[in-house]
């Protein structure tokens, strides 16, 4: 599932109204849609290919994997509260970092990706452990047989997790979870 040009147009209209930047991603290329607000996305992912573009020059024939809004945390958080409610029904909208808001097609998130993977591998959902710390991990933490939140996870992730690690992801919490719940003999 991907975004059409019309989806990107709707998100661009919304982000312009909220004075936020919007980048549209298609097959590994980030189209930085020019606006009054500078996108910070290149600072998060400098290895990606960035192409500055006016909205009018985006191809209506292309499809887009997702859109992102990378902006200073405080104004981003304030703007999120003002996003049109119907957009939350039409799209997946979540923060994946303090300064990064992601926009995805409805039902495109980590849980659906894991479900497709285990179906292909013939693994039962109850055998899946998922680890995470940000709002974009919420769906897979809820979905997994064992949802593991890092100590530094956002409160929403900790609230739905089966386990909260005693350390952060920077302190090898994922390795701890694997040792504790996968490798340790019962």
Which positions does each model-derived feature cover?
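Mg2+-dependent phosphoryl-transfer enzymes with acidic/Ser/Thr/Gly-rich catalytic loops
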Residues: 102-186
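Glycine/small-residue-rich loop that forms an oxyanion/phosphate-binding "nest" at active or ligand-binding sites
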Residues: 1-7
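Catalytic cores of large soluble enzymes that bind and process phosphate-bearing ligands
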Residues: 3, 71, 166
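Short, flexible loop segments at the rims of nucleotide/cofactor-binding pockets, characterized by
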Residues: 1, 46, 142
């Amino acid at each position: 599932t991907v975004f059409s040009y019309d989806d990107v147009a709707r998100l661009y209209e919304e982000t312009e109204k909220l004075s936020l930047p919007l980048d549209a991603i298609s097959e590994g290329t980030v189209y930085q849609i020019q606006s009054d607000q500078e996108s910070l996305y290149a600072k998060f992912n400098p290895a990606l290919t960035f192409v500055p573009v006016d909205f009018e020059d985006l191809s209506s024939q292309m499809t887009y994997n997702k859109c992102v809004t990378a902006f200073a945390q405080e104004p981003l958080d304030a703007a999120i509260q003002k996003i049109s409610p119907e957009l939350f029904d039409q799209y997946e909208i979540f923060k994946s970092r303090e300064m990064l808001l992601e926009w995805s097609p409805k039902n495109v998130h980590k849980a659906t990706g894991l479900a497709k993977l285990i179906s292909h591998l013939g693994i039962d959902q109850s055998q899946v452990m998922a680890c995470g710390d940000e709002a974009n991990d919420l769906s897979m933490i809820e979905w997994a047989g064992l949802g593991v939140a890092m100590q530094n996870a956002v409160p929403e992730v900790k609230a739905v997790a089966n386990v909260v690690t005693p350390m952060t992801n920077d302190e090898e919490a994922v390795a701890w979870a694997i040792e504790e719940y996968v490798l340790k003999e019962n």
